[in-house]
UniProtKB/Swiss-Prot annotation:
Organism: Sclerotinia sclerotiorum (strain ATCC 18683 / 1980 / Ss-1) (White mold)
Superkingdom, natural source: Eukaryota
Function: Inclusion body (IB) resident protein that interacts strongly with lipid droplet (LD) proteins. Involved in LD-mediated IB clearing after protein folding stress, probably by enabling access to the IBs of an LD-stored soluble sterol derivative that acts as a chaperone in inclusion clearing.
Family: Belongs to the IML2 family.
Protein name: Inclusion body clearance protein iml2
Gene: iml2
InterPro entries recorded: Iml2/TPR_39
One Pfam family it belongs to: Iml2-TPR_39
Subunit structure: Interacts with lipid droplet proteins.
Length: 645
């Protein structure tokens, strides 16, 4: 209640629209300097004043630093700053409604800019709670996210109604809007938007979460196919004419950025606990709407646009690029839920021209080259991009470089890069040391027969780093659960240790099919590999590279791993071969037979994907696989529609 009466305690200067807009300009300039790797100047500008914009800027700066490294101490610090920003923006929102000299928009109710600041602070604060590792804090975080989303959606609704009136008006020019537009929008106040929250308390959430018998529908299903028309599209020309004021642009782009991120992120969640919380708070993601809103946010020369671009490029080059089955037809570039590579390339070029010194865009350029199977080019960029004034960006770059050295079979560089990851990040030391160790395993196998002295050195290093990994498992948790790779690696190394003891050999000599290729497979490096890299993978999978091939071949799990990895490499190596169908004569297949062949393969693909989607048992990498499966199903459904099947 103190928020409501605080203004009555101490008189404060009246708000002046011009001064407030200048604060917005200053903070946007500071945040863009942050993106351009000028950390010191950005920090200096953000501490210069005490406006809501400055408070939020400081909070977002801390939040981005914490998110990039997922460091708990930084998350806690960011949460404190964001709470201050939340309180300040709420107070300013109330004040802006009363001051006649405050900014008045033709589109939004008075004080909406501060309501947006409040919602952004609420949203980012909630994410820090979700990442805290505590289920209780995560539940509170999701509830807060829901409240923030309802507020943002309310602002969107106001805006869309205004745009509909403008779009359908054939007599009123945009340059001289009639008072009726403004008065119709002013009928709804920011208080009414802010209180559009669900009638659900955090206590209700805790109670429902703790009840194991509480039923809820299965909402971890593939997203719906794209609709023919989309009510959330805005004509770019209309938007350019309507949104000319800096504060209006801040609201317009900011709402789209936040709503788009929420809808996109929650459409990808397949974790059962997360899904249960989302269902209880009444939240459902929407991948298509989320991506469309983010693309709309990229149109403007401001910080919101840059973050929307980062989100889109990260989503497409990271998550979507991680998937195997994606649209490849001529219209694929216009499909927001596939991989629109031409749009992504154009967006990257635009952002690099705006922020030429930013390490983030170089990182995305390297990811894009990896997607195009130019791993050497990606590695060159990452090596040149290895130093940033923001240590979190350096850490992400190091991680990306470590993955690239893994995919390109640079074993020495791979070991070094993963050890560097362990020094720069505390997120998953088990994974970092394990991959460093298996990099030395391949060096050992390369020299085991040809150079025994060198092999012995590599063997010792392999054993050292592999055995370092299991004791560090469980240091980081999400929703009180261990990371999937931690669980898998502990099990894997434990099996090798038991074998080594039973067979009377060193740990490295008890290892079966290449764990190096296995990690390439898990991180979808097979898809990013060219013919040379795929041939190297197949070489590493040769049975004679193992010290004890006969004993390993008696293990069903090892045999299955070998066949899976080999099959995956062969499949990608031969993906461009023409379809053979049922013809063995070598004659060209008729159009009718080719269509039948494609239909048969498409239906078979869908059947297998649906079987995977409804797999009855849980497994360690279920969450990683779920997004790939749902994206593949979306692609298959789309292709069936295009083919008329």
């Amino acid at each position: 209640m103190s928020r409501w009466f605080k203004s009555a305690v101490k008189a404060t200067p009246a708000m002046v629209a011009e001064s407030e807009e200048q604060h917005l300009r200053d903070v946007e300039a500071a945040m863009l300097k942050l993106l351009n790797d000028d950390i010191e100047e950005a920090d200096k500008l953000l501490k210069k004043h005490d406006s809501s914009y400055h408070h939020l800027g400081r909070g977002i700066s801390g939040f981005l630093s914490a998110m990039m490294g997922v460091e708990k101490d930084l998350l806690k610090e960011a949460a404190v700053i964001l709470q201050d920003a939340e309180n300040k923006s709420w107070d300013d929102m109330k004040k802006a409604q009363k001051d006649s000299t405050a900014f008045q928009s033709n589109i939004y109710p008075q004080g909406t800019e501060y309501l947006l600041c409040y919602s952004v602070a609420q949203l980012t604060s909630a994410i820090t709670a979700v990442l805290s590792g505590s289920i209780t804090e995560a539940v509170k975080g999701f509830y807060k996210l829901r409240k923030a989303y309802l507020t943002l959606d309310g602002i969107l609704e106001v805006e869309n109604k205004y745009l509909e009136k403008i779009a359908h008006s054939s007599t009123t020019s945009l340059s001289s809007r009639t008072p009726s537009h403004k008065s119709s929008m002013a009928a709804l106040t920011v208080d009414e938007i802010a209180h559009r929250t669900a009638d659900l308390s955090v206590g209700d959430l805790d109670e429902k979460m703790l009840d194991p018998n509480n039923p809820y529908p299965n909402i971890s299903r593939p997203p719906s196919p794209p609709s023919v028309t989309n009510p959330y599209d805005i004509d770019p020309e209309l938007a350019a004419r309507v949104f000319t004021n800096r504060t209006d642009i801040f609201i317009h782009s900011g709402v789209r950025l936040c709503c788009g991120l929420l809808l996109l992120v929650f459409s990808m969640i397949e974790n059962p606990i997360f899904n249960k919380i989302l269902y209880i708070v009444g939240f459902k993601g929407d991948r298509e709407r989320g991506t469309r809103l983010l693309w709309q946010a990229t149109r403007y020369q401001n910080f919101n646009s840059a973050i929307a671009a980062l989100a889109l490029l990260g989503y497409y080059n990271g998550l979507v690029g991680f998937c195997d089955i994606l649209p490849t037809d001529d219209a694929a570039d216009d499909n927001p839920t596939g991989y629109p590579k031409n749009k992504c390339q154009a967006l990257l070029v635009d952002m690099q021209s705006r922020y030429p010194h930013s390490k983030l865009w170089k990182l995305e350029e390297a990811r894009m080259l990896s997607y195009k199977q130019d791993l050497k080019g990606a590695l060159v960029i990452l090596e040149e991009n290895s130093k940033s004034k923001m240590k979190q960006i350096t850490m992400i770059n190091t991680f990306e470089m470590a993955l690239t050295t893994l995919f390109i079979h640079e074993y020495e560089k791979s070991a070094t890069a993963w050890i560097n990851c362990s020094e720069q990040s505390a997120w998953s030391p088990t994974l970092y040391f394990y991959i460093a160790g298996i990099s030395y395993v391949e060096l050992y196998r390369n020299t085991r027969l040809s150079d025994p002295a060198a092999a012995e050195v590599h063997k010792k290093k392999a054993i050292e780093f592999i055995l370092k990994a299991p004791p560090l498992a469980g240091k980081q948790k999400v929703m009180a659960k261990q990371l999937p790779f931690d669980i898998y690696i502990v099990s894997k190394v434990g099996k090798w240790e038991q074998r080594a003891k039973a067979w009377g050999v060193d740990l490295v000599d008890a290892i079966g099919p290449s764990p190096f290729v296995e990690m390439i497979y898990f991180w979808n490096g097979v898809k990013k590999s060219g013919t040379v890299e795929l041939e190297k993978c197949l070489d590493l999978l040769k049975k004679e590279r193992m010290t004890c091939p006969e004993k390993c071949n008696e293990d069903e799990e090892d045999v299955a791993i070998h066949l899976l990895l080999r099959g995956s490499c062969c499949s990608w190596r031969e993906k461009d071969l023409p379809p053979g169908g049922d013809s063995t004569s070598g004659e060209k297949m008729s159009e009718k037979k080719l269509l039948e062949y494609r239909r048969e393969k498409l239906m078979d693909c869908e059947e297998k994907l649906l079987k995977l989607h409804s797999w009855p048992q849980t497994y360690v990498f279920e969450t990683r696989m779920s997004f790939k499966i749902s994206t593949s199903l979306l692609t298959v459904k789309r292709h069936k529609g295009l083919m008329g099947f």
